Amino acid sequence: RPACAAAGTADNDEPPTLAVVVPLRAPATVAEFCARLPPILRRLGVRHHIFAANQVDALPFNRGALVNAAFKALSDARRARRHDWPRFDYVAVHDLDRFPAEANASCAASIRGYYSFPAGAPRVLHPNSFAGGVLVLRSALYRAVNGFSNVYWGYGEEDNDLFLRLRWCGLPPRHGDAVDACMVHDDCAACRKQKRDLDKKGSADGARLRGHEERLRARIAQPRRHMLHDGLSTFNGSVVGPPRHEPCGGSTITTFDISLAGIAGAAT
């Protein structure tokens, strides 16, 4: 599609640089993530920087809006020349608890391609999701589909909404090789509790998820209409204070504290 055509070409002649964006909320810790992922990226020769988007308000967690917040903060900082970050040619939207299975020697060949520059379609590193867990895509394509929707509060469906946008572009994500065996998911305790709570009778989280499922079904036919008015361009949360820079497994992690209180229709 013409609106997505620019996302299929290279941005520059330099080796591509990856921004790893990790949406989270305290007290979640990045200790294990930093111990495991950065050494893998260095061994693979991937130029990268890691960013955490930390939700600091009391609203339900909003993974998609947090990624939009980080992407916008990076773009704004680069335009204002507030940091010496390079242009990030591609992005890995990365769950905190999912990693390549380096201990499995038979996975070495598959893992080599996981975080490489996705010149064509995005790459998803989750065996049971169309766009969740870990999604690697070009920055230009993320902008072309207007990023994530901002309206999926709590658990679920923001990744499927993004899939509809990418499919509309003609670039639905493809699964990485052998991700069922070669990506490890160490589900956090809070995540397991949240998933259990979804099934409880009268659960607010469960009711919210059912509302998300209805919204998603309503968007299937015309994702373009919705993505123009809900996404990166309409994000109106805020970064609270300056970013924090900390060591992360031999790399650096930059944390943006994000308040989503300004988003229209927050937590509906």
Please place each PLM-identified region on the residue numbering.
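A recurrent flexible, glycine/aromatic-enriched loop bordering the glycosyltransferase active site
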Residues: 120-137, 144
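Conserved donor-nucleotide/metal-binding helix-loop-beta segment in metal-dependent transferases, i.e.
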Residues: 81, 99-126
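Juxtamembrane luminal stem/stalk of type II transmembrane Golgi/ER carbohydrate-processing enzymes
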Residues: 1-17, 33, 248-268
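Short, well-formed alpha-helical segments that are part of the catalytic scaffolds
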Residues: 27-41
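C-terminal catalytic/acceptor-binding lobe
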Residues: 151-154, 160-268
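Short beta-strand-to-loop acidic/aromatic patch adjacent to the donor-nucleotide binding site
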Residues: 79-99
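Short, conserved alpha-helix that lines the donor NDP-sugar binding/gating region
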Residues: 63-75, 163
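Hydrophobic targeting segments
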Residues: 16-22, 37, 49-52, 70
